[in-house]
Amino acid sequence: QFRPSYQIPP
């Protein structure tokens, strides 16, 4: 399974 890494804003 491909799990995309999202950039979470601070």
UniProtKB/Swiss-Prot annotation:
Compartments in which it is found: Secreted
Tissue expr: Expressed by the skin glands.
Pyrrolidone carboxylic acid carried by residues: 1
Primary subcellular site in the record, as a coarse category: secreted
Domain of life the protein comes from: Eukaryota
One function term, GO molecular function aspect: toxin activity
One GO CC annotation: extracellular region
Secreted in keyword set: yes
Stated family: Belongs to the bradykinin-potentiating peptide family.
Protein's name according to its UniProt entry: Bradykinin-potentiating peptide Phypo Xa
Lineage, opening ranks: Eukaryota, Metazoa, Chordata, Craniata, Vertebrata
